[in-house]
Regions:
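The structured alpha-helical core of multi-pass membrane proteins
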Residues: 1-628
């Protein structure tokens, strides 16, 4: 037993490492297709010279080292919430570390929520620029195919999104190996060109980056807007930490991804110095002519895999936002019986698809799309730094002498990248910012609206003890079976119970008041799932606890109630739900237009029946009209 355990550990680490290469690093792994080309595009005015090429290469190399390796691989992955990472995990840590109602809590939550909203803008641009840049390789192989680049890109995008409902379980096992081959090809192409001009390796010296700024001044600073393309996808390293673990991600980055990326970028630099005409598409010109079409095919596969990771990440982020109370319920379908994280959300899927197609048609080329790329990414990077600094100093009590220098270094880098991308706002960068602002408004409106709704319901609530005393003194007619009343409040009598009693004049033999409560941790163990309190004979309050990455399942939770002495038979249990009809009204607590938006969101939210996996034939819905 002891002899085989290490082998099992090694094999599982290897499998997770290969998986991480496919999912975590797909986005950053496809950046070499367009990054060097953009750095020397006309918009930055850089001429191809030895100093400029070495300067750009040095900036890219040290961006990979400082931002990806030092900040995310080493630092950010320490700021985890019980092993989980990402903006929502950071937000939940902020909730835990701040006092309810404080101004500090409000500002940090608003900042984190805006960072999460920016992810959606990034999630729209990534599939568009990735797939389009790959298919553009056809122009190099066969110029006659140039008119078909946009249509072929749209076909690939449509197929990608249409396959989402079937899930990625069948082909997911190929993601890691295919991306591993991709990184091997990146390294090989880079090496083949480096050996023809090894002088480019001098760019490892950061003094070339410093000299680049000194020589090019403001134009050199603006070129950071292209350099940042080399580190897009870094948020995925932090977000997917819970899926693969810290060690596999760090091993994959250190042994495979970083060396392959560095070699490829240096190889492109060597090619440009040897043949400046290759600047129109240095990535594809690195390959021999006979390998162009296979390379286009492999690049398309790699960009589809990178896009899949972003799409799955968008689903996951949305589900977490729902759990944390920032988003209305949406339909969620599971596409795998074994992997709980593999989900499909139709509304998100088709919205993303339309946005991606619109971007492909509207911008027309990956070069034009690159002008819109970077603003959202650098915004998220900056917000990550601020929230992580707050968490490690407040929650984990890191000493200021260690935390402050790190904050200064990371913020200086993040703000520099963000500032260099601000000029892109007029050239398409407004799009992800607009998406972020709209979604931030919707998230904040939903959160505020739910709080306002609970406030409106509170004055009409009846205390549980007076209610029990009333039905004890004047017992209503009791009918066989169990009634479960879902309620968001953990105090008072649910409106659905009062409506049922007023209209039907009966009460079931057993009554359960059930509240589903979402916690600021990723997962809650089954042993801690339920709180059961007996309020009176055959009258109980049950609180079911779920983490923000858990899947609420009321029937399964009630099965656990047996451990607390409560037996449930689904065929003898009725579930009573309240459905509110919201009426916007001019008030001081929320503007009328936001109340109208909240009412629309509530009206279009998916049914609690399906979301909580309650059998539809056991549900009774009772309506309530509420003025906001």
């Amino acid at each position: 037993m002891s002899a085989t355990a290490p082998e099992t550990t090694k094999s599982s680490t290897l499998a997770l490492t290969v998986g991480a290469i496919g999912v975590v690093f797909g986005d950053i792994g496809t950046s070499p297709i367009y990054t060097m080309r953009e750095a020397f595009s006309d918009r930055y005015g850089l001429v191809v010279s030895l100093d400029n090429v070495l300067g750009v290469l040095s900036l890219i190399f040290w961006a990979l080292m400082l931002v990806v390796t030092l900040k995310y691989i080493i630092f950010m992955m320490r700021a985890d919430n019980r092993g989980e990472g990402g903006m929502m995990a950071l937000l939940s840590l902020v909730l835990r570390a701040t006092r309810r109602g404080s101004r500090q809590r409000y500002l940090l939550l608003s900042l984190g929520l805006f960072g999460a909203a920016l992810f959606y803008g990034d999630g729209m641009i990534t599939p568009a620029i990735s797939v389009l840049s790959a298919v553009e390789g056809l122009e190099i192989a066969t110029p006659a195919l140039q008119p078909f680049v946009i249509p072929l890109t749209i076909v690939v995008v449509v197929l990608l999104f249409m396959l989402q409902r079937r899930g990625t379980a069948a082909v997911g096992a190929l993601f890691g190996p295919v991306t591993l081959v991709w990184f091997a090809v990146l390294a090989l192409l880079g090496l083949l060109n480096i050996v023809q001009n090894a002088a480019v390796l001098a760019a490892i010296n950061p003094l070339y980056a410093v000299a680049f700024f000194a020589d090019n001044k403001f134009a050199g600073f603006l070129a950071l807007g292209a350099v940042v393309l080399a580190i897009t996808g870094t948020e995925g390293i932090y977000t997917d930490m819970g899926h693969f673990g810290k060690k596999p991600i760090r091993v994959a980055w250190s042994l495979v991804v970083l060396p392959s990326l560095a070699l490829n970028y240096f190889g492109q630099g060597a090619l440009i110095l040897r043949d400046p005409q290759a600047l129109s598409h240095p990535f594809y010109y690195m390959a021999p002519e006979w390998a162009l079409l296979p390379l286009v095919g492999l690049a398309t596969a790699a960009t589809v895999i990178a896009s899949q990771a972003v799409i799955s990440g968008t689903y996951s982020l949305t589900r977490q936002a729902i759990q944390l109370g920032y988003c209305p319920r949406l339909d969620i379908f599971h596409t795998s019986e074994s992997e709980i994280g593999q989900i499909y959300m139709p509304w998100i899927n088709w919205t993303l698809m339309l946005a991606v197609i619109g971007l492909v048609i509207g911008f027309g080329s990956s070069s034009n799309l690159a002008s819109a790329y970077g603003v959202a990414v650098t915004g998220m990077m900056t917000i990550d730094t601020i929230l992580a600094f707050f968490v490690i100093t407040t929650l984990w009590k890191w000493t200021k002498w260690l935390a402050v220098p790190l904050l200064i270094i990371f913020l200086f880098i993040d703000v520099s990248f963000f500032s260099a991308n601000v000029h892109k706002l007029l050239h398409g960068g407004w799009f992800p910012i607009l998406i972020g602002v709209v979604l931030f408004t919707l998230f904040a409106t939903w959160r505020r609206g739910r709080g306002l709704l609970m406030k409106r319901l509170a004055p009409g609530a009846i205390g549980i003890q007076p209610f029990i005393e009333s039905i004890t003194q004047h017992p209503p007619t009791r009918v066989p079976g169990t009634a479960v009343f879902l309620t968001a409040a953990t105090e008072g009598v649910p409106h659905a119970l009062l409506h049922n009693l007023n209209h039907n004049k009966v009460l079931h033999e057993r009554v359960v008041l059930l509240t589903v409560q979402n916690e600021d941790i990723p997962h809650v163990d089954d042993s801690e799932r339920l709180e059961v309190e007996q309020l009176a004979p055959d009258f109980h309050r049950v609180i079911a606890h779920y983490g923000f990455k858990d899947e609420p399942d009321v029937p399964s939770a009630l099965e656990l109630a047996r451990q607390h002495g409560l037996e449930f038979s689904m065929m003898e249990t009725s579930f009573f739900l309240s459905r509110q009809t919201l009426v916007p009204k001019m008030g001081r607590e929320m503007s009328l237009w936001r109340e109208k938006v909240f009412a629309i969101m509530a009206r279009n939210a998916s049914s609690a029946t399906g979301y909580f996996k309650i059998p539809a034939n056991r549900v009774v819905e009772l309506g309530t009209r509420i003025e906001l």
